[in-house]
């Protein structure tokens, strides 16, 4: 379907095609003539870091708001949207509306993987805290520049940080 992309970390179907994160890019691919090869190949975002393998961009996931969420990774860079500067990212995650391609920063900025529950509450993780709840979503924090929130995420794992991890691969 697609060749010459390095290290894809996430795939999310949309509108007959797929969004793919392959650090340092977010792509959109679509087959328009039925030959099982992507005829549309768009580089949507670029600039994600590749320096820390446990914290590269990843995790395309639909939210209840019909936006796609993903971890931007911990590599601070200024992202380029279709070749033009978008905004710098550091310890945040992102979401975007796939119809308008409007991007926003969201609370997170941890490592690999995240999820939403049935009520839209977002959970993130890192290698030392395997389950954290996003308590203060960025879209609410940015409404009041005078509100200083501490602890944007909280640890919710019953067994605490640094719980045993068991491989499922050989």
Question: Predicted segment positions?
Answer:
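Beta-propeller domains with acidic blade repeats across secreted/periplasmic ectodomains
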Residues: 1-170
């Amino acid at each position: 379907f697609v060749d010459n992309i390095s290290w894809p970390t996430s795939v999310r179907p949309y509108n007959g095609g797929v969004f793919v994160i392959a650090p340092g890019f977010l792509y959109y691919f679509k087959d328009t003539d039925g030959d099982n090869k992507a005829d549309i190949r768009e580089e949507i975002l670029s600039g994600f870091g590749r320096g820390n393998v446990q914290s590269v961009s990843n995790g395309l996931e639909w939210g209840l708001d019909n936006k796609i969420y993903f971890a931007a990774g911990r590599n601070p860079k200024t992202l380029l949207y279709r070749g033009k500067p978008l905004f710098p990212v550091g310890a945040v995650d992102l979401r975007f509306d796939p119809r308008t391609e409007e991007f926003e920063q969201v609370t997170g900025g941890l490592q690999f993987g995240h999820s939403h529950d049935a009520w839209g509450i977002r959970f993130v993780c890192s290698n030392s805290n395997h389950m954290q709840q996003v308590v203060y979503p960025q879209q609410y924090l940015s409404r009041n520049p005078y509100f200083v929130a501490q602890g944007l995420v909280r640890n919710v794992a019953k067994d605490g940080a640094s719980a045993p991890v068991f491989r499922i691969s050989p």
